């Protein structure tokens, strides 16, 4: 039994979010939630909400036992990029890229 949850267009760069996602891959959901709760990275809060949604989906839709669930797959893809300008000297401008992420978490009891 598998349950999926996604957070699309999260306002955090994929590079920063993947650091947290790599830590919880393959863990028991209780251990993953503990790790995310005590991490002081912004991405940990976002990934934690997606993980909690996946657990709720497994429990409600599939009737799964929460104690047996594991994080089967977690990955972070690039979302759309917001392009902004920063004024510089002599009338020039630099481009600032505000990156977004698509966070996907799949939990399974296998």
Curated annotation (Swiss-Prot):
Disulfide bonds: none annotated. Transmembrane segments: none annotated. GO terms for biological process: translation. SUPFAM superfamilies: Ribosomal protein L22 (SSF54843). One of its GO terms (molecular function) is structural constituent of ribosome. It holds the Pfam family Ribosomal_L22. CDD domains: Ribosomal_L22. It comes from the Bacteria. Keywords: Ribonucleoprotein, Ribosomal protein, RNA-binding, rRNA-binding. Part of the 50S ribosomal subunit. Belongs to the universal ribosomal protein uL22 family. This is Large ribosomal subunit protein uL22.
